[in-house]
């Protein structure tokens, strides 16, 4: 990473960290920009295979810049839209120079969420972190590890303009999620930035 001093580190134990910060003011979205990015969402929510069966993802999702591979499936990338390109440029300057891909998720209301998971790193460039930027409705961003009585969780508020950075070694140990809740009635857009190998 390039400028860690701009982000607040949270100690997770065992030498692992989770970093939190804010977008610079010039990159925050006003209501018109949020509405324009919201209009980019796909018409149909994607499906993934779980236990051999297709399950519809509980949010809209689209990859930009580089194909996104997860659970043995590939989400073909579209060109990076001008509305979100400044976020990719900023992350390349301020977080890590090899970040080259975006995954945008659109959440609406209480039924949209993402469950606990580790990001697949097989196709990621060595040493690149995972960067997530939040816009719109504030949601909980949860880290968790272990199961049953041994399960640990840490919650962080993903408010408008919040930036979270998950180093690769942290992703290997801790899962992350955006839980569902009846109290969420608005819209949220998350932009996740990663660094993938090019050329397959």
Stretches found by the model and what they are:
Residues 1-200:
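Non-heme Fe(II) oxygenase metal-center motifs and adjacent flexible, charged/small-residue loops
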